[in-house]
Amino acid sequence: MGSVVIGVAKMRKMRADAANNPTPLQVDVERLLTSGEIAMCQQIFKNALNYSKVRIVRGGILGIPTLTGNAMTPAGYIHLPNQEYLNIKDFSIAKNTTDKHWFIHEMPHVWQYQLGENAVWHGINQLCKGGYGTTVLTVDTPKSGDYKAYVTDLSGADANKKFNEFNFEQQGRIIEFWYDGGYLQHENPYREHHQKSIKIIGYVEYILRDFLHNPKDKNLLPKV
């Protein structure tokens, strides 16, 4: 009986201690870039970015990334849908090659932000223009088409444009094509996106010529 009383007393003390000194629940909501992800980005942006300031964030922004399944990068942080945040701990070793060029597509928005561009304003501007509601089909889009804000015709009507003449989403798409065509050629090379990237890589290189020479140049930021 005495041991039972002692046991009950210990339990009460443990409960009191827990109430007075609660252990905070650690919830994984954001992370830094991994060394592998930084190496990926340096192939494109060189030392134009402060990589230590970049975060990968779980959800946020009123839950829009999780509801839509799309990443959003309004202020230098990449907000992923909840499930993708939990599943992809390092984009540089992601099993799905699509995830790699998805990540690279978002990094130009980090670049735009760090060089002083207001991505939120550009996003609202594209939304008002119907850029995220109208699907368009061109030679650069997937067979299912793409939202108007992202659409390019790099081997046709857009071939002679400078990089700063593309909107902020198109800039992300162009760099995405460059990365897939130039750095993912040994990863499932028969993918539709890769084949398209290879086909237009000469046009992409011409459009990116100033960016590839000096990615720190603020004159390359989108003017539309």
Question: How should these model regions be labeled?
Answer:
Residues G69-N70, I78-E106, A159-N164:
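Short pre-active-site segment immediately N-terminal to the catalytic Zn-binding motif
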Residues A9-V27:
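Acidic/histidine-rich, surface-exposed loop or edge segments in extracytoplasmic proteins
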Residues L25-Y77:
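Auxiliary, metal-adjacent structural segments of Zn-dependent hydrolase domains
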